[in-house]
Curated annotation (Swiss-Prot):
Keywords: DNA-binding, Homeobox, Nucleus. It holds the Pfam family Homeodomain. InterPro entries: HD (IPR001356), Homeobox_CS (IPR017970), Homeodomain-like_sf (IPR009057). GO terms for molecular function: DNA binding; DNA-binding transcription factor activity, RNA polymerase II-specific. This is Homeobox protein HD-1. The gene is HD-1. It comes from the Eukaryota. It comes from Encephalitozoon cuniculi (strain GB-M1). PROSITE patterns: HOMEOBOX_1, HOMEOBOX_2. It is found in: Nucleus. The keyword Nucleus applies.
Length: 151
């Protein structure tokens, strides 16, 4: 009976992974269909930039919501079976999609404006303090790798 929580948690993580893989495959298939359409017709369908941006943001939000909800369910389940907190189970890393968004922004500007930080916080569903900390830590980590060793 004591193996049940670990088994259920493992299965929930597998479901989360399958969802992410399926989502990525669907996005790739959509891109392939658009490319094929563009080859056959000669161009992509005309969609205004605002509509395209809105749709992309909504799709991203839905994907993130599902992944976050699965992650929350996993955490909630683990908390139920680990009420004393004896075992450290909290991940200290952001999910991959958040890290990728922050990395892309970092490549553009290592010192983003407050507006950009607020935008990232909204997209990633993090606080601006978490965004600030991530950029500070990232700058500190990359600073050590740029010039090689100094003696």
């Amino acid at each position: 009976m004591s193996k049940l929580p670990a088994l259920v948690s493992l299965r929930m993580n597998e479901i989360r992974g399958i969802y992410i893989e399926t989502n990525n495959r669907v996005v790739e298939e959509m891109d392939a269909v658009i490319d094929e359409f563009a080859k056959d017709v000669g161009s992509s369908p005309d969609i205004s930039t605002n509509v395209r941006t809105y749709l992309e943001e909504r799709i991203r939000y839905i994907r993130e919501f599902v992944v976050d909800h699965i992650g929350f369910s996993i955490s909630e389940f683990r908390t139920l079976y680990n009420p004393n907190g004896n075992e450290s189970i909290k991940s200290r890393r952001f999910p991959k999609f958040i890290t990728e968004a922050l990395e892309r922004s970092f490549e553009i500007d290592q010192y983003p404006s407050e507006a950009e930080k607020a935008r990232l916080a909204k997209i990633c569903k993090l606080s601006t303090k978490q965004i600030n900390n991530w950029f500070t830590n990232k700058r500190n980590r990359t600073k050590g790798h740029e010039g090689g060793r100094q003696y």
